[in-house]
């Protein structure tokens, strides 16, 4: 009986550990998507209030990536996944294409809301995964709540 419990704990523990790594990887990629997009649009912004909001959001993404890095080290000796060069190029191209005729604050806020909504959806899907450690769950909640808060702030600029 003890052997069965050991085997079950070993298998289940491995599943949870892999889930934690996968969830942290997805959160990190989501943060870097936000960082990459904000790096691009910040160059287009002159309005001081809008710029300050985006800089604050950028900083929160950076803080989250630092927390992800720290927690990731408890599960793996590798680095968490970031966005690929191809995805960065596609992000840059998409923003340039969508703002070539209209680079107003309203248009950029709209683009950022749409991108942030994708992050919220991914965060909510990850939260529905019940097999994660409490610290990973908290980080996932913080990621999702941060994005939900910024959507509300971005709406003022539509």
Question: What is the predicted function of each stretch?
Answer:
Residues 25, 51-59, 83, 87, ...:
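Short, charged, amphipathic alpha-helical segments
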Residues 1-16:
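Short, Lys/Arg-enriched N-terminal segments with co-localized hydrophobic residues
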Residues 19, 53-63, 93-96, 101:
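Long, non-catalytic architectural segments outside compact domain cores
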Residues 66, 70-118:
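Carboxylate-rich helix-loop segments that flank metal/cofactor sites and access channels
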Residues 48-78:
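Acidic (E/D-rich), amphipathic helical modules within compact regulatory domains
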Residues 35, 65, 69-72, 93, ...:
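A structural signal for well-ordered alpha-helices, especially hydrophobic packing surfaces
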Residues 17-45, 107-131:
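Alpha-helical bundle segments that constitute or directly flank the non-heme di-iron/ferroxidase center
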């Amino acid at each position: 009986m003890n052997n069965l419990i050991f085997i079950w704990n070993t298998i289940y523990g491995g599943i949870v550990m892999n889930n934690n790594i996968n969830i942290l990887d997805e959160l990190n990629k989501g943060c870097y998507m936000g960082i990459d997009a904000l790096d691009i649009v910040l160059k287009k912004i002159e309005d001081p209030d809008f710029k300050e909001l985006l800089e604050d959001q950028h900083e929160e993404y950076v803080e989250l990536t630092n927390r992800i890095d720290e927690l990731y080290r408890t599960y793996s000796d590798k680095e968490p996944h970031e966005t690929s060069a191809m995805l960065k190029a596609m992000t840059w191209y998409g923003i340039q294409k969508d703002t070539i005729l209209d680079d107003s604050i309203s248009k950029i806020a709209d683009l950022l809301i749409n991108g942030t909504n994708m992050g919220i959806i991914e965060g909510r899907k990850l939260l529905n995964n019940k097999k994660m450690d409490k610290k990973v769950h908290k980080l996932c909640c913080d990621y999702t709540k941060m994005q939900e808060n910024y959507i509300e702030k971005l709406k003022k600029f539509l």
